């Protein structure tokens, strides 16, 4: 109890920081309810064919990609809490609208609107936390991610119970629960204060040209290169959603029940270790330095996947478990690194627009990731070795471009920061 109380008391951002954690929990519970059954809802309740469901999901996902840069750009011009509240209301209305029709094109339109709101809200929540937590943003990200994962798990468990019932009414109640969660989040957001204007805490007070016209991230080649490299580093997500389940399904030795157990292991590890690991990337310099061990962990994960195909049932299970642990550690380290560097590389005057463009990395990975892991599976053990090695090399590449992007802050701030802390 004392440790739990201390953990909760020391959340950066004060009362608004606590409120945003409740928002993350409620949001992810709702998302967990719907994400687990969305395809089944469209199949069994709306009576769509497999091809129609696939097209609907693909189109809504493609439209959602625009949400991140659009939301970030708007947030640089309007009060952040108002934009966030409006987006949550939009998500709630989109979910309710799905309940009102079985028309294919209307379902596609409502799903696309919900996807757009979802991606925009994700980026703006990150921007809010960045402005609110200031120099403690990495720790806040870790706490927020821990709470969000717990929310996903709770939502998934509730959805599993409804799936056991398997009726159309059960699916509708889950969708309604998703809508209610967004409405509750909108209400909670109205109670949050507007955070101070974004200031990049890695730079000193002698920033150059702070009042210049905001830069466009689309003309910033260095930042776009960073975003492209981060897209590759997000591929660990595809390992758990597609790679491990398919690899296990096609293995002659791995027990098929291992896949969900490894997903549980991933979730438990993130909840248990994300906050402790965050302290290793609490500054921009430390986050950049983490790219070196992150490179090794990605390579280790790919190697473990490859070796899992060379032995019997025990060897396969052990190495697949080892691969899951390695990719989970990589996921946690990369979450810390990505949060800090994406903010540190963004100019103060256009922080929202830049973080919106960075949000494209995760969106793009959702399309590229499944293709990358299925290619690795098709190539066999060598494919997994190449998969891990490619991400490892990308980590080293990112380590270099970050150094070149922030030459002055990286050289001047550590001396000040070390002496002050």
Q: What are these model-predicted stretches?
A:
Residues 1-18, 192-232, 415-421:
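Juxtamembrane intracellular "pre-TM" segments in multi-pass secondary transporters
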Residues 6-61, 222-266:
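Helix-loop boundary and gating motifs at the non-cytosolic
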Residues 44, 154-173, 250, 368-387:
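Transmembrane alpha-helix termini and helix-breaking/packing motifs in multi-pass membrane transporters
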Residues 65-101:
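Conserved MFS/SLC helix-loop-helix module at the cytosolic interface between two early adjacent transmembrane helices
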Residues 66-79, 163, 272-288:
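Helix-to-loop junctions at the C-terminal end of transmembrane segments
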Residues 82-96, 289-305:
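Structural signature of the two symmetry-related core transmembrane helices
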Residues 110-148:
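Cytoplasmic helix-loop-helix junction between adjacent transmembrane helices
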Residues 160, 180-201, 397-401:
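C-terminal membrane-cytosol helix-exit motif in multi-pass small-molecule transporters
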């Amino acid at each position: 109890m004392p440790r739990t109380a201390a953990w909760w008391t020391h959340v950066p951002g004060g009362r608004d920081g606590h409120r945003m954690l409740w928002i993350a929990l409620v949001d992810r519970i709702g998302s967990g309810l719907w994400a687990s059954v969305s395809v089944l809802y469209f199949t069994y309740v709306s009576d769509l064919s497999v091809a129609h469901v696939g097209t609907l999901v693909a189109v809504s996902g493609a439209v959602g990609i625009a949400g991140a840069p659009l939301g970030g750009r708007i947030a640089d011009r309007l009060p952040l809490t108002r934009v966030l509240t409006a987006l949550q209301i939009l998500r709630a209305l989109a979910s309710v609208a799905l309940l009102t029709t079985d028309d294919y094109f209307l379902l596609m339109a409502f799903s696309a609107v919900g996807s757009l709101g979802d991606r925009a809200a994700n980026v703006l929540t990150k921007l809010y936390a960045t402005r609110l937590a200031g120099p403690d943003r990495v720790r806040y990200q870790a706490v927020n991610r821990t709470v969000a994962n717990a929310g996903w798990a709770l939502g998934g468990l509730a959805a599993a119970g409804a799936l056991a019932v398997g009726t159309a009414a059960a699916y509708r109640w889950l969708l309604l629960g998703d809508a209610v969660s967004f409405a509750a989040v909108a209400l909670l957001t109205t109670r949050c204060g507007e955070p101070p204007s974004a200031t990049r805490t890695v730079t000193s007070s002698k920033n150059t040209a702070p009042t210049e016209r905001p830069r466009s991230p689309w003309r910033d080649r260095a930042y776009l290169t960073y975003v492209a490299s981060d897209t590759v580093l997000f591929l660990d997500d595809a390992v758990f959603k597609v790679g491990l389940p398919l690899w296990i399904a096609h293995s002659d030795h791995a027990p098929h029940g291992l896949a969900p157990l490894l997903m549980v292991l991933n979730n438990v590890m993130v909840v248990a270790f994300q906050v402790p690991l965050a302290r290793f990337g609490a500054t921009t310099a430390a986050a950049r330095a983490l790219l070196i061990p992150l490179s090794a962990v990605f390579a280790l994960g790919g190697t473990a996947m490859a070796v899992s195909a060379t032995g019997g049932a025990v060897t396969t299970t052990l190495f697949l478990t080892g691969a899951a642990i390695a990719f989970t550690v990589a996921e946690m380290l990369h979450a810390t690194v990505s949060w800090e560097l994406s903010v540190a590389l963004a100019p103060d005057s256009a922080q929202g627009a830049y973080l919106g463009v960075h949000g494209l990395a995760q969106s793009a990975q959702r399309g590229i990731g499944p293709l990358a892991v299925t290619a690795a599976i098709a190539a066999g053990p060598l494919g997994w070795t190449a998969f891990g090695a490619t991400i490892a090399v990308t980590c080293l590449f990112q380590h270099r471009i970050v150094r070149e992007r922030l030459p002055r802050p990286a050289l001047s701030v550590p001396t000040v920061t070390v002496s002050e802390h």
